[in-house]
Amino acid sequence: GLRDALYDAGLVADNRLAVAGASMGGMTALGIMTHHPEVRSVACLMGSGYFTSLAKTLFPPQDLTEMTARLADWEVTRALPRVADRPLLLWHGDADDVVPPDGTFRLQQALKREGLDGNLTCLWESGVRHRITPAALEATVAFFRQHL
């Protein structure tokens, strides 16, 4: 798979494998974190850990039950301890008009409530819609510099 190709190409130094993504890519990065402990840190920009509930607002209702059932195994909120044991960056604009920021807030609060927020960095950018800002990119680079 992709992981093996990265290692084979010599793109992973000292087993320092990390994943970052924005929007759906951020959700994918969170899902990867639930199943791949070899990933040392993850940055999720304007994504959501609540895949099944977000899917209900983004997709037409016709095949929703089957689709959300497949997403459930990857949902971060069902695997909080597995994502809390490594550095995690959550970044979201508080005016996001595509992926509601409440999913990021709920994940942040769930980790705090369970006492699992020791490796969490959660950054909010005021007035930002569904866009990646220069500040978000700078924060992501700084995060990986610190945690890789």
What are these regions (language model features)?
Residues 33-38, 109, 141-142:
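Short, surface-exposed basic-aromatic patches at helix termini and helix-loop junctions that form
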